Amino acid sequence: MSTAAQMAAVQARIGQGAVINVDPGQSIGVRSIGQLTVDGTLNAWGGTITLGGVSVQPTVADGVEAKGHDRSIWVDEHAVLDVAARAATAVDSLGRRYGVVGQGGTIVIGGVIDPATGIASAANLFVVVREGARLDASGSQALLDLSGAGPTLVASRGGTISLASNNGLYLDGTFIANSGGAGAAGGSLNVALETPLYLDTAAARVRQARELVVSAADSGAPLPIGSTPEAVAGGLTYGHGRLTANQVSAGGFDNLSLLSNGLISFDGDVSLRLGQSLSLYSGAMALTDSAAKPSQVFLTAPYVRLAGVGNNNSATDSLVRPTVQGGVSTQGTAGLLSVEASNVLDVRDSVNFGAHAERSKALANGIDRRAFDQAHLVSQGDMRFLARSADKTQTALTTQADLNLIAAQIYPATGAVAEVTAGNTGGEFDPARTLRIGRVRSTDPALPYSVFGSLSLNASTIEQGGVLRAPMGSLSLGVDGGITRATKVINLLPGSLTSVSAGGLVLPYGGTVDGVTWRYDGKQVELLGVGGTRSTGNAAGGVQLAGGALKVQRDAI
């Protein structure tokens, strides 16, 4: 059984000039219970390279992690991790070119993100990729003679690079997953900064909020040039993480997933444009303290997912998790957040703009980050509110300021319960803030394949000018909460559609194996009659409008 002394003393090192090769499509794995340093070359073309830690007895690990340390997966400045694809071609007896054009491989440093749960399997080691290091998971191409098409340039997609740590991320190297050529997609970059459970006696150093900062360009490496794992002892900061938009675009990535069990903060003006997908998992999204007040953040992809994190329980009897999950900032709102999906935009779990957390048993230092003054979520197709991934509570999208939701149609997914709140102050709604619903085209799209969902929209002022649907479910606009929390005005604008009708909708919905119990997604279905309520208190079906004033304009349905 490994001891704390072994964790501190054992090292795995691949030195400068060392080269490890495996056959194309095969794997290289290097793990250590202590420090892991790579300054050589690892070649697994079209295969997999994994750098990680080794699990030890929980009683040993808990004590070590509670004290804090500087052990890391350190990818040094001369390191090359190459899983880029190489096409293999030959010529047959008739002079025709044939071959295999495989896609880029996979590099995993520390762990990976599980998109179904919003949890990362991260290492209890810092992840450090020094400037000069190169991680390459690009695709390939080859000229082949295809039957019926003749000479054709065939290209493959880029692979995947995943970096995950429970401690901190220092990402100054080069990450590449280019498309192999025209017609093929770029690869995927996944970056995760997780927050584990610590003993409640843990040192203040480890009980820090995790904050993954996204900036436009590099503001200078936080570690001095020439640093070594030994030289930075005591210099690595728990909760540190930084990634630049330049790194993403220069790497040729078409898919980006970011996870922070705490904050994803934007440092000034940032623009991220992905060719396929963008997924953000966090306790809150906000602006850094150094970001200028008029900062503008633009996030664009065909598919966008905004989600919370799965590991968000704060404590047990003897364990604490120093995480930040939303909260109302004490600072004024600032800047603009614009999120646009050309196909589909999904919202899941608890999505918060702005954050605040006081110093506590779990969190050694309080933290406060500004919410966006204006948030625009736009989908040229559907905007879906999905059921939470881990528990039975509702999905929630919350901001202190104005919120605009614009899509072809907006609806909860099957069985999902979701709530959207603008102007949140922790008490009554901010009377100066508005929740606006809009549409991207004048024609109504076909009914979504969704039933029995529930969606509530809350703000002091609600302007409904879009297409809101919840077939055979419930839609609730406004809150009649008396003096402390009430909607003042609901405006149903011309061309708006607010509907729970399922007329003409045909879709599969579960089944029965015994002729008695009907199940959907493995669970027994609870069907409520008209006017019934769920255990959460939400109406099971129908449209509810609650507010001090209701204004229904011509052509609102």
Regions picked out by a protein language model, each given a short descriptive name:
Residues 1-557:
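Extracellular and secretory-pathway beta-repeat/beta-biased strand scaffolds
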